[in-house]
Design a protein with these regions (language model features):
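Active-site-proximal alpha-helix that buttresses catalytic centers in soluble enzyme cores
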Residues: 2-3, 11, 15-99, 127, ...
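A glycine-rich beta-strand to alpha-helix segment
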Residues: 117-137
Length: 181
């Protein structure tokens, strides 16, 4: 990971740039209870393409937190397949289902500071609201506009975070990329 150096009155220190990847699950089928909705054939293709895109851009998560709903579990499986051998084992989190931006951010705040690249796979409206809340003023303009105008299935927002996961709250993560599949 890249490092950013800054000098302070008390001397110099280094803060590592961390990467946060927020993803909405891929396209899901209808007709079942919400928690048990599977991905469509297109959803499987979207999630696999998302994993391959992440790998091609060097956006490799060290930890993946996923909602425990079927469609997010399946999305995570296909993304991991696209990431290949570098894919970590996903941690399923019931607290990422039907969740607000505040709850997603609270989950991020609990991540070990030893993790430098984190991926969260969840649902609307939480993923879009969290991405909007976290965007700093120096975020990429095109990516920011994409996040504001929609967060379709299998969309990914990629942030750079300078500082601790525990302190992440709002307007303090730089959105550097956004992609929908």
């Amino acid at each position: 990971m890249a490092e950013n150096s800054s000098n302070t009155a008390s001397g110099s220190h280094r803060r590592e740039v961390k990467r946060l990847i927020i993803m909405r699950h891929a396209e899901a089928d209808w007709g079942l209870n919400d928690f048990d909705r599977p991905l469509t054939k297109r959803g499987h293709e979207q999630a696999a393409a998302a994993g391959a895109w992440l790998a091609s851009r060097g956006y490799i998560p060290e930890q993946i937190m996923s909602s425990s709903a079927l469609r997010t579990r399946q999305t995570t499986t296909w993304v991991s397949d696209g990431l290949g051998a570098k894919a970590p084992t996903a941690h399923l989190d019931e607290g990422l289902y039907e969740v607000s931006a505040s709850r997603i951010i609270a989950r991020i705040n609990s991540v070990s500071e030893n993790v430098h690249a984190l991926m969260v796979v969840s649902h609307l409206p939480g993923v879009q609201d969290a991405a909007q809340r976290l965007m700093s003023p120096d975020s990429d303009l095109n990516a920011s506009m994409d996040v504001y105008y929609g967060f379709p299935p299998s969309s990914i927002a990629v942030f750079e975070v300078l500082g601790e996961w525990a302190l992440l709250d709002g307007a303090d993560a730089r959105l550097v990329d956004f992609k929908s599949f």
